[in-house]
């Protein structure tokens, strides 16, 4: 099992959101070893954890607050998830063809919390290939008029390792 702690930024954003909003459903998209899923489930949130790797999912899905699904989100004629969530978390996952699908997972008055690598990360490590790195302010620009951006950061982060990332919190205000 991976022992990396959840992203402090993700944890802080969830705490800010949950102080002011009733949260019933959270989805962790491309969750890997589930560092965010486990953290949130241990805080008694109901979490849906999605990943392509069953072996990774198997390491943490014995938690009663986690429902998991092994899905390849990049190999479907249709988007396999047909639900809405109060919080949608995406960390270190980038498949541009799914931006619209990810946005559509967010309930009205729900939140998208997205953190991933961007151009500039090449000097710090993987990923280095352009197709796995967001362009300048790209994450900020994926939202449409159904969303209000609550927080955006682009720059260096130091934990767990030094990297160059974009981080976004957006609230869905319309369906």
Regions found by a protein language model. Give the residues of each.
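S-adenosyl-L-methionine
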Residues: 1-21
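A short, conserved alpha-helix within the catalytic core of class I
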Residues: 94-106
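Core SAM-dependent methyltransferase catalytic element
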Residues: 156-175
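Conserved beta-strand signature within the Rossmann-like core of class I S-adenosyl-L-methionine
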Residues: 110-121
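Conserved SAM-binding strand-loop segment of SAM-dependent methyltransferases
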Residues: 63-76
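A short acidic, Gly/Pro-enriched loop at the edge of an enzyme's catalytic core
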Residues: 78-87
């Amino acid at each position: 099992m991976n022992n990396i702690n959840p992203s402090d930024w993700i944890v802080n954003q969830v705490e800010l959101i949950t102080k002011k909003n009733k949260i019933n459903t959270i989805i962790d998209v491309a969750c890997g070893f589930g560092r965010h899923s486990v953290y949130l489930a241990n805080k008694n949130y109901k979490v849906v954890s999605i990943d392509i790797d069953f072996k990774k999912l198997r390491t943490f899905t014995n938690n009663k607050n986690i429902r998991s699904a092994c899905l390849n989100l990049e190999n479907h004629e249709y988007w396999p998830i047909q639900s809405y969530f109060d919080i949608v978390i995406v960390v270190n996952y980038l498949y541009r063809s799914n931006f619209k699908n990810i946005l559509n997972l967010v309930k009205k008055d729900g939140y998208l919390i997205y953190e991933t690598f961007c151009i500039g990360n090449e000097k710090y490590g993987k990923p280095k290939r352009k197709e796995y790195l967001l362009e300048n302010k790209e994450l900020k620009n994926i939202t449409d008029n159904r969303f209000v951006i609550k927080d955006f950061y682009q720059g260096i982060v130091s934990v767990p390792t030094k990297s160059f990332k974009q981080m976004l919190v957006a609230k869905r205000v319309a369906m």
